[in-house]
Curated annotation (Swiss-Prot):
GO biological process, one term: translation
GO molecular function: mRNA binding; structural constituent of ribosome
GO cellular component annotations of the record: cytosolic large ribosomal subunit
Superkingdom field: Bacteria
Protein name, as recorded: Large ribosomal subunit protein bL12
Family under the similarity heading: Belongs to the bacterial ribosomal protein bL12 family.
Gene from which this protein is expressed: rplL
UniProt keywords, alphabetically: Ribonucleoprotein, Ribosomal protein
A Pfam family matched in the record: Ribosomal_L12
Amino acid sequence: MAITKEDILEAVGSLTVMELNDLVKAFEEKFGVSAAAVAVASSAGPAAAAEEKTEFDVVLASAGDQKVGVIKVVRAITGLGLKEAKDIVDGAPKTIKEGVSKAEAEDIQKQLEEAGAKVEIK
């Protein structure tokens, strides 16, 4: 009588973790293979990295000297209240907007920099 796949699976299922570890090592030695996961190289490699980013985050790095003006611009951009906008400006670096287009991110950056802030687009 031949051993079936089901018999093997049932036998393996009843083993402890230590016994399974020993079994894997025995397979590696007997057949000269490794149970390590193989890293598959992406076929799109450099092309994927060259793909242009479509969503950007606008980060307020610092408010600079014109804090009041920066708070006003943050309020206008985000629609937040005075306290919330002040907390963002005081807590810099903080993300002002997430997932915006490149044009919108550059527009926000321009407004904030004109108010005296330092801004990063990520």
